[in-house]
């Protein structure tokens, strides 16, 4: 592969049918990669306990039905746990981790305390300050600890990092002591995605802008591990009329739902293209023309607000 080759990726979780918002982001990630003459990889983020095996194949079928293709075989995070363990071992050797016994409720209460709240969404550092004796007592309590990244000096608090986004420009976000490994021993999202993107040679990450706050953490971690940092492009989400993220309870929001209403995969593809301000196509095979004229600078910057039809029956 040439050093200049663009490598994009799509990384859904096989926990259910993809809805229109998922498919729209997949289409965008594919267009970014293919319009640059690059590769488009598929990775299943399947470390979540909510994974349901039947959705590996159904998600592949839905995306293929819209005319999107990918390079190589899809990979699964569940097959790559050794990579995550190696990364964690590296950070542990450098004394960049510590055990955390906090519950979500305890974190929320500590972050909101009047003696100096942490920035919104940031871990307040409770377990970082535990003495050895306190840590031993926590371990004896039987709660399996998570593993957090140690960011900066003990008295410094969360850091800030500015990243450049292809669609949104400069974004400054918090880099706190985020989780690397969950209490059940599984790699946490931020660690797994950084390790995977580097291992797969990903140069470009196109994803929903709900993940923008995670980007400074991921860039910081990649640099700590000596890994290449991809370019990022965060795109607006699909929302329902109430301004909330589209969900399956909102109506006919999956490809299967739309087919049951008598629509075709082409109808769904054109709906997605129209939402992006792109020309509609007469057949699935006409996507090459969209790729040829694709310009990310012309994409909408606002969410797509859409009210899907009711489910049939």
Predicted regions and their residues:
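Non-catalytic terminal extensions that flank enzyme cores
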Residues: 1-17, 35-40, 137, 152-156, ...
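N-terminal Rossmann-like or analogous alpha/beta NTP/dinucleotide-binding catalytic cores
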Residues: 1-115, 209-210, 214-227, 285
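Noncatalytic linker/hinge segments flanking ATPase motor cores
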Residues: 19, 48, 81-86, 138-141, ...
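Short, mixed-charge aromatic SLiMs
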Residues: 48-58, 240-244, 292-300
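Alpha-helix initiation and N-capping motif
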Residues: 56, 81, 104-107, 120, ...
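A general structural signal for well-ordered secondary-structure junctions
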Residues: 69, 97-98, 116-117, 133, ...
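Active-site cores that bind ATP or allylic diphosphates and position pyrophosphate for catalysis
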Residues: 105-248, 254-259, 308-313
């Amino acid at each position: 592969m040439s050093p200049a080759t663009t490598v994009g990726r799509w990384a859904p979780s096989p926990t259910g049918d993809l809805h229109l918002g998922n498919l729209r982001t997949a289409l965008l990630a594919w267009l970014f990669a293919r319009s640059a003459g690059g590769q488009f990889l598929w990775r299943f983020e399947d470390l979540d306990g909510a994974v349901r095996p039947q959705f590996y194949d159904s998600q592949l079928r839905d995306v293929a039905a819209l005319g999107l293709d990918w390079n190589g075989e899809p990979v699964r995070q569940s097959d790559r746990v050794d990579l995550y363990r190696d990364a964690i071992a590296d950070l542990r050797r450098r004394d960049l981790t510590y055990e955390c016994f906090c519950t979500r409720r305890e974190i929320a209460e500590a972050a909101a305390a009047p003696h100096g709240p942490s920035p919104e969404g940031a871990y307040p550092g409770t377990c970082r300050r535990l003495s050895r004796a306190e840590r031993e007592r926590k371990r004896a309590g039987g709660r399996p600890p998570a593993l957090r990244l140690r960011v900066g000096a003990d008295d410094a608090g969360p850091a800030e990092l500015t990243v450049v986004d292809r669609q949104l420009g400069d974004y400054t976000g918090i880099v706190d002591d985020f989780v690397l490994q969950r209490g059940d021993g599984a790699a946490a999202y931020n660690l797994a995605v950084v390790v995977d993107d580097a291992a797969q040679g990903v140069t470009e990450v196109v994803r929903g802008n709900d993940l923008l706050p995670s980007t400074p953490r991921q860039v910081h971690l990649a640099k700590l591990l000596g890994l290449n940092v991809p370019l990022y492009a965060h795109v607006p989400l699909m929302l329902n009329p109430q301004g909330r993220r589209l969900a399956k309870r909102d109506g006919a929001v999956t490809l299967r739902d739309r087919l049951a209403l008598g629509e075709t995969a082409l109808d769904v593809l054109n709906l997605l293209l129209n939402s992006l301000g792109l020309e509609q196509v007469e057949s699935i095979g006409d996507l090459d023309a969209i790729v040829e004229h694709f310009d990310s600078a012309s994409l909408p910057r606002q969410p797509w607000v859409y009210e899907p039809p009711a489910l049939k029956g």
